[in-house]
Structure formats: structure tokens, C-alpha cells
């Protein structure tokens, strides 16, 4: 029996909550909290009669630590699942520390205001020291490690698919397939078609900031940074086919470089269609991806937030998105003195996700791992004081849970490698 507070009620949170309610013997009570309480109430109404989980809702501004503390102290959860925006990771972690509650999220911290002078000074120092310039990184949350250790609390970072499952795949490969992993290529393919000329499959603001940033990868002990979309490869994905993919910076590279001993290279690739790239470059050229506020008709607006309001809500894409995703990791390395390769991945069908939980596969592949990570914490399988990423825990029960609850793994011991 457990009591869980979920902060957020967007597309990913909706999936995670519905999947939690399928495991009502563990998730016995749940409070869904968001700035827009009406969305929480609508989801509870949808789930009425379909679960034994006792559901309540609350209104909260996740940017306000005092509001969060009041809510957490009032509800007294065993775990806070942060499925809001990565901008709010630190305020929610602060509130969990103040209230003595375990924490988890699906994406690492990044600031909403990238022009904030205090943040900018720390960011520019990190760029020089580390060698990559993405706005998002783990350093802000890793800085909480001792606080969580001293409090006897667990914080689980980035438990979606990528990051999240991809790191569990790496831990699994190291545990069962290799004595030494030399290279890791993380491949994220979305073969879905939603019929729009341009739309994003998750939060547009986060998505567009991520893909328009310089790419980077880890090689021979240091970061190598490249211009955005500068490295392109074609790959034939199981059940999807040939797709163009581009090298991006992605957060799990940062943790895997520290947790996979002796790894020589880690890269992350994501597929994009030409229409998406053309629209994104045009929007960037005219300043619509900027996070710097501007004045318009006497009002201050942030261009990328205005753009987000114009684009289709990712949560609305479910009924019209067809096709499949394929996300996984390709490894090279050594086992018993012999070189070997290994590929572990998941294929997920957009329409099957929609029929089950009313979502497209992008939200599904993030929401299901969030539920499974919470399940690991609540059942005592993933509990140790401190701040950790997914690969720092035993991957076996987590991957078994994914197999059971909708994201089964596939494997190949003779995959085509990415050059």
C-alpha cells in the first residue's frame, strides 16, 4: 500500500497515472496536482470505476516551493512523481527535502529563463569546464546528492525512455552481455505520421530547444561538440524501415560517461523528417525559438512560448498518429576475451497506445517507464539515500516490469552498426 503525489497532468503524466492505476495493489492512493486542476479532475472522471486506486486532485504552482511544501505536508505521500516541466525540478526537490519524501522525475533540470545572470554565470563556467553548451545538464540535481543522503531519501532522475530505459539497457548490457563496453549508440526513431506539416510529439518548448542546440558526444574521455544537425546517418529500424537520423546532445550521455567504466564513445541519434527540419530552421531564423522576452503591444512575451500556444497540443495527436517508434541502444565491447555486438530496443505502436490510454507512443514510452520507476521505489527494489540516475540501480526488475506493462524489449546479437 502506498500514497503517491503526481505533479503534472499533461500527456506523459496522463499515461503514467493511468498505468499506475492498472497496478492498484501498489498504487493504492494518488493525488494528481497541477496548475490547472480542471485537467486533473477530468482525468479522475475518466478513470472512475476502472481502478481501485483512490484518486484525489489538487491545484499547485510547481514554481512555488511554499505551495509545494503545503501540499506535500497535507497529503503526506510516500513518493512525489514530478511529471511537470524540467524547469520545476529544483523547486520540487527542495519541497521533497523539506517534507522528508522520496522524489523522481523524467527529465533533468533546465532553466526557463536562460538570460538569468546568476544562472548564466554558472552555465558559462560549465561550458568551459565540460565542453558542451546544452542548457540542460545533471549538475544542478547532482548537487543535491549529499542533502538527500543526509535526509535518508532517494531521488531518481530521468526515468522516462530516453533518458531512463536507455540507461537501464546500458546497465543490463554491462551486467549480462559484456565484461567491457567500448561504444554505445542510442537510437531514437519515431516512424509515426500525425498528418500535420509541423507539430512536436512532446512539449514544443522543450523539444525545439533540445533539437536546435549544438550536438555533442562523448569520445575518449571528453566531449566533442558539433553544429546542430551536422552529423546525419541513415538506419534501417525494425518494423519502421529506413530513416534519416541526426546526432544530438542528450542528457543520458552525461551520466553514462561516469557510470559505464572505460566506455570509449557514447552517441545519441534521433530521426527527423525533412519537413520538420525545414520548419524548425525557418522558425529559428526568424527568432521564434528564442527564450528571451520581447515587448509586443505593451505586453512581454517569450517567442518560443508564444509558438507553443500556436502549435497542436501533443496530447491531441493520439487519434491521428499512425506508425511505430523504435528506441534502443547498440553496443560494442568484449565478453570472455572476445569482441561482440549487441542491440536492445523497444518497438511501440502509436495506435495501440491510443486505444489503451488515449495517447500517442511518445507520451506512452515516457509515461510507462515513469510508472515502472515509481513501482521499483515503492516496492523497495530501488531505494538508497542520495540522487541517482536509472543505470545506478539493478536493471532486471525494471526491464521485467516494462515487459509486463507495455514496453517489451527486443534483442539482436548481430546488429548493423552505425558508422
Give, region by region, the residue ranges found by the protein language model.
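Glycine-rich Rossmann-fold phosphate-binding loop(s) that bind the pyrophosphate
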Residues: 9-10
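N-terminal Rossmann-fold NAD(P) dinucleotide-binding loop
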Residues: 13-14
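Helix N-cap at the beta1-alpha1 junction of Rossmann-like dinucleotide-binding domains, i.e.
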Residues: 35-39
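Rossmann-fold cofactor-recognition segment
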Residues: 50-64
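Conserved Rossmann-fold cofactor-binding substructure of NAD(P)-dependent oxidoreductases
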Residues: 61-77, 88
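N-terminal Rossmann-like NAD(P) cofactor-binding module of classical short-chain dehydrogenase/reductase
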Residues: 72, 78-81, 103-104
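Rossmann-fold NAD(P)-binding glycine/threonine-rich loop
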Residues: 107-153
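C-terminal catalytic/substrate-binding lobe primarily of soluble NAD(P)-dependent oxidoreductases
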Residues: 175-419
Amino acid at each position: 500500500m502506498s500514497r503517491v503525489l503526481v505533479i503534472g497532468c499533461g500527456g506523459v503524466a496522463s499515461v503514467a497515472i493511468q498505468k499506475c492505476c492498472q497496478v492498484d495493489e501498489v498504487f493504492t492512493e494518488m493525488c494528481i496536482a497541477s496548475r490547472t486542476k480542471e485537467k486533473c479532475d477530468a482525468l479522475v472522471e475518466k478513470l472512475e470505476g476502472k481502478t481501485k486506486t483512490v484518486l484525489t486532485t489538487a491545484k499547485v504552482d510547481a514554481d512555488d516551493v511554499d505551495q509545494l511544501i503545503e501540499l506535500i505536508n497535507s497529503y503526506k505521500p510516500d513518493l512525489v512523481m514530478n511529471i511537470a516541466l524540467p524547469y520545476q525540478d529544483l523547486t520540487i526537490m527542495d519541497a521533497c527535502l523539506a517534507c522528508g519524501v522520496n522524489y523522481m522525475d523524467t527529465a533533468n533540470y533546465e532553466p526557463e529563463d536562460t538570460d538569468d545572470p546568476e544562472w548564466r554565470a554558472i552555465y558559462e563556467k560549465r561550458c568551459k569546464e565540460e565542453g558542451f553548451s546544452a542548457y540542460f545538464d545533471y549538475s544542478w540535481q547532482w548537487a543535491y546528492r549529499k542533502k538527500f543522503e543526509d535526509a535518508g531519501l532517494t531521488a531518481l532522475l530521468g526515468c522516462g525512455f530516453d533518458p531512463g530505459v536507455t540507461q537501464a539497457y546500458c546497465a543490463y548490457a554491462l551486467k549480462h552481455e559484456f565484461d567491457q563496453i567500448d561504444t554505445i549508440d542510442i537510437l531514437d526513431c519515431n516512424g509515426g505520421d500525425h498528418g500535420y506539416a509541423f507539430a512536436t510529439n512532446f512539449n514544443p518548448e522543450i523539444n525545439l530547444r533540445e533539437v536546435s542546440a549544438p550536438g555533442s558526444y562523448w569520445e575518449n574521455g571528453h566531449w566533442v561538440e558539433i553544429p546542430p544537425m551536422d552529423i546525419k546517418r541513415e538506419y534501417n529500424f525494425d518494423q519502421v524501415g529506413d530513416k534519416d537520423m541526426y546526432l544530438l546532445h542528450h542528457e543520458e550521455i552525461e551520466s553514462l560517461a561516469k557510470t559505464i567504466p572505460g566506455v570509449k564513445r557514447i552517441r545519441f541519434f534521433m530521426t527527423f523528417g525533412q519537413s520538420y527540419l525545414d520548419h524548425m530552421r525557418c522558425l529559428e531564423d526568424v527568432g521564434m525559438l528564442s527564450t528571451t522576452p520581447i515587448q509586443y503591444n505593451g505586453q512581454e512575451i517569450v517567442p518560443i512560448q508564444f509558438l507553443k500556444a500556436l502549435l497542436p497540443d501533443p496530447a491531441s495527436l493520439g487519434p491521428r498518429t499512425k506508425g511505430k517508434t523504435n528506441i534502443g541502444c547498440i553496443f560494442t565491447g568484449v565478453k570472455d576475451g572476445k569482441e561482440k555486438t549487441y542491440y536492445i530496443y523497444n518497438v511501440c505502436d502509436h495506435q495501440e497506445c491510443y486505444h489503451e490510454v488515449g495517447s500517442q507512443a511518445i507520451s506512452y514510452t515516457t509515461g510507462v517507464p515513469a510508472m515502472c520507476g515509481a513501482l521499483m521505489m515503492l516496492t523497495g527494489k530501488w531505494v538508497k539515500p542520495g540522487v541517482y540516475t536509472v543505470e545506478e540501480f539493478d536493471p532486471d526488475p525494471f526491464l521485467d516490469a516494462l515487459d509486463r506493462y507495455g514496453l517489451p524489449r527486443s534483442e539482436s546479437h548481430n546488429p548493423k552498426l552505425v558508422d
